[in-house]
């Protein structure tokens, strides 16, 4: 999978995703096999994303490497891989937990996020990420820095739990 750094306060929608993917410099993307300039659009798949206005299906672009044949999803950094809950919502849950605030308050802003989703995010953080962040002195804020440091140290998006290869792409234009 390849994650591109998107604007921090840009609400995710199909239109914003499509626009961001169109602006990507595909010739600069690197496959997990190490080759650059070899990724071509292979297809799309749909995944559910929970947003403040409700859940929606996001059509995610997949690319295939012409060198090794592997396929990769192209995801914005506002998405946590293998989760329907966006990063900004997860970040709010964890921040509330750390500050001792009522963590279910996030459900007020995200109507499709229920208490079980909140518990799942907290469990994922405690089991897989809390010690990682502490050991590398990674702060939760700003989010952009959190994302970059998680990729730098662990080659994963914050709160990603599957060890699937994930590369961060920072568009230079």
Q: Where do the PLM segments sit?
A:
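Short, conserved DNA-binding cores of transcription-related domains
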Residues: 1-79
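Long C-terminal interaction/binding lobes of large macromolecular proteins
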Residues: 1-12, 26, 134-173
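Intrinsically disordered, low-complexity regions enriched in small/polar residues
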Residues: 6, 19, 28, 46-47, ...
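Detector for Asparagine
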Residues: 9-10, 40, 101, 109, ...
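Arginine residue identity/basic-tract feature
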Residues: 47, 62, 123-127, 148, ...
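Short, positively charged, Gly/Tyr-enriched micro-motifs
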Residues: 69-159
